[in-house]
Amino acid sequence: MVYKTKLGEIEISDESIFTFEKGIPGFEHLRKFALVFPQETFPIGWLLSLEDSEVGLPVVDPKLVRADYDPAVPSEDLEEIEAENQEALLFFCVLTIPPGKPEKTTINLRAPIILNQKKKKGIQTILENEDYQLRHLLSEEIERSKTVV
């Protein structure tokens, strides 16, 4: 189906659509989002609202940025998205890209977006691990990962 989104009108398959029962912090009134990976921005993807064409969050697989990223998801969050365990879940972290200053891009490792592909449900959780902050400079995390791997 074709949807009007922050990235323009795009074809979105049902497999890419997820329901966030409680919305996403800051967008609690929005429930339906699609995860898309345009060729122009890959490996950065977009979590696009299907209810408000102005809302779209740039996201990336945190393992591409921090090789040792190992979130411990609270059990109540796993229950909310009907996940039996973490193994079958997809994790994405939101990027903040300042206009005109892409070198200042930060990644939010503290509050990942978690998607249950099987149930098509998602949640943004807040992790207890204090090593993960709301704003990590993306370039520093990529450099750090080179020494970890």
Swiss-Prot record:
TM spans (from-to): none
What is a single cellular component term in the Gene Ontology annotation? cytoplasm
**What's a single GO BP term from this record?**
bacterial-type flagellum assembly
Q: Which Pfam families does this UniProt record tie to the protein?
A: FliW
Q: Does the keyword Cytoplasm apply?
A: yes
Location relative to the cell: Cytoplasm
Q: Which domain of life is it from?
A: Bacteria
- InterPro entries referenced in this protein's UniProt entry, alphabetically: Flagellar_assembly_factor_FliW (IPR003775), Flagellar_assmbl_FliW_dom_sf (IPR024046)
Q: Which UniProt keywords apply?
A: Bacterial flagellum biogenesis, Chaperone, Cytoplasm, Translation regulation
Disulfide-bonded cysteine pairs: these are none
Complexes and interactors? Interacts with translational regulator CsrA and flagellin(s).
Q: Which family does it belong to?
A: Belongs to the FliW family.
Its biological function?
Acts as an anti-CsrA protein, binds CsrA and prevents it from repressing translation of its target genes, one of which is flagellin. Binds to flagellin and participates in the assembly of the flagellum.
Protein name, UniProt field: Flagellar assembly factor FliW
- This chain is encoded by the gene named fliW
